[in-house]
């Protein structure tokens, strides 16, 4: 019989990609669930997925037995299939330097000092820990956009988790908005990636812009331009 492993769900995302993103880890510790999350203004999907796994592993002492559950095949295959070859070639792939090498090397060092079993799980398939990590990563992205400290873990006891329940019904008013064909298509694609309707996606974007106000929107746009 192997060691008793602490189960961890790690998830990250970015919208648009590249753009503002968030990461999260849900640690099912014996003493209770620990939740970590954060975000960055200018990043990518893969960097947020890697960051989620890194922040989760940083929570544990060396030698800890962990089962890391991720819905990112990029993360799982990087560690379990590709990394050994990259290291043998001096952190290079067959076509050039390893992408996100800073995070890959950090992840490699952390995993080497711990007993980690890597498990891929299908995203948005109803697995509670994965769904929770996904919602927290979304919250991390929103907080990064609102100017809160990004990239720092914020542990939460299970009974003090941030409220992420669906919004209560409110009175609505229909407003017609004319969009260019390109913008309408981009909106539809982004909503599809987020798993929501274009109307809900647009409403969320409008609310966020109203919260940020013009100076905040300008700051986010400048960060994205620097990252591009």
UniProtKB/Swiss-Prot annotation:
The keyword Metal-binding applies. GO terms for biological process: DNA replication, removal of RNA primer. Binds 1 Mg(2+) ion per subunit. May bind a second metal ion at a regulatory site, or after substrate binding. Its cofactor is Mg(2+). GO terms for molecular function: magnesium ion binding; nucleic acid binding; RNA-DNA hybrid ribonuclease activity. Transmembrane segments: none annotated. Endonuclease that specifically degrades the RNA of RNA-DNA hybrids. Its EC number is 3.1.26.4. This is Ribonuclease H. Mg(2+) 2 binds at residues 11, 134. The gene is rnhA. It is an enzyme of class 3 (hydrolase). GO terms for cellular component: cytoplasm.
């Amino acid at each position: 019989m192997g060691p008793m492993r602490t189960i961890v769900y790690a998830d990250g995302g970015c919208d648009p990609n590249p753009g503002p993103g968030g990461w999260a880890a849900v640690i099912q510790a014996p003493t209770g669930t620990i939740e970590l999350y954060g975000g960055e203004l200018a990043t990518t999907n893969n960097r947020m997925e890697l960051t989620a796994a890194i922040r989760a592993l940083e929570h544990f002492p060396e030698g800890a037995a962990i089962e890391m559950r991720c819905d990112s095949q990029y993360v799982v295959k990087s560690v379990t299939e590709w990394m050994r070859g990259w290291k043998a070639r001096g952190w290079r792939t067959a076509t050039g330097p390893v992408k996100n090498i800073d995070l890959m090397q950090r992840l490699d060092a952390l995993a080497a000092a711990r007993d980690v079993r890597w498990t891929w799980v299908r995203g948005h398939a109803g697995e509670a820990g994965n769904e929770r990590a996904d919602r927290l990563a979304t919250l991390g992205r929103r907080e990064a956009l609102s100017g809160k400290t990004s990239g720092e873990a914020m542990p939460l006891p299970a009974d003090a988790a941030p409220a992420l329940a669906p919004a209560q019904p409110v009175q609505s008013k229909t407003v017609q908005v004319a969009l260019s064909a390109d913008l309408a298509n981009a909106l539809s694609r982004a909503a599809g990636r987020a798993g929501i309707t274009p109307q809900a996606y647009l409403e969320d974007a409008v609310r966020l812009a109203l919260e940020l106000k013009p100076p905040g929107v300008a700051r986010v746009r400048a960060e994205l331009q620097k990252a591009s």
